[in-house]
Amino acid sequence: MSLTLAIDTSTDVRVGLAADGAVLASSAVTDPRAHAEQLMPLIDRTLADADRRLADVTQIVVGVGPGPFTGLRVGVVTAHTLGFVLGVPVRGVCSLDAGAAGHEAAGEFVVVSDARRREVYWARYAADGHRLAGPFVTPASELPDLPVTGPGAALAGGESTPLDGGLLALASPELPDMGLSPLYLRRPDAEVPTTRKSTLLQPRLAPGLAR
């Protein structure tokens, strides 16, 4: 049985385990400043809730945004590191695509997330969840006149919905593989000096988890 670990740090920190078309367990932390500190403990908790071990994972899927620089970097680097340690494939998926796949609609719609600075990340979708345009980052006032969904929908006059429903979609092989390059869409708020070695994102694995 294949076991997919799904990670998305484009908004909050969200983790899910999926097998045979069903989510076995999922967890989330809503503090946007705690991505680096919370991701590995959240993965451990989700595995425990599903009575699985990290060594049972057969593939990893990670949301590559769009989203903030630091949050996306945490998720993508952690997924890449775990994939290397476990020797399993890692796919990158547009986080908005996953949100669209979990949304029922009668016609075209827009998935929106908060980009801060009075802007939103968004993409336009057909009723079947196929992406028609985007992703973009613009003021909410520039969104097309279509129904909106997603965690930033309230910024456009809609009802915000978390991307929880997209975790199963994130693990679906039907979503296009975007690679592991994060979709920042704009430069980070703060630049890390190039001469300083980054200490971010070194997941600490318990002994015996590697093959």
Segments the model singles out, each with a brief description of its role:
Residues I43-Q59, P144-L146:
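Phosphate/pyrophosphate-binding loops at sites that engage ATP/ADP/AMP, CoA/4′-phosphopantetheine
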Residues A25-A28:
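Short amphipathic
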Residues A48-A55, G83-V93:
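Phosphate-handling active-site elements
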Residues H35-A50, L96:
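Short, well-ordered amphipathic alpha-helical segments that serve as non-catalytic structural scaffolds
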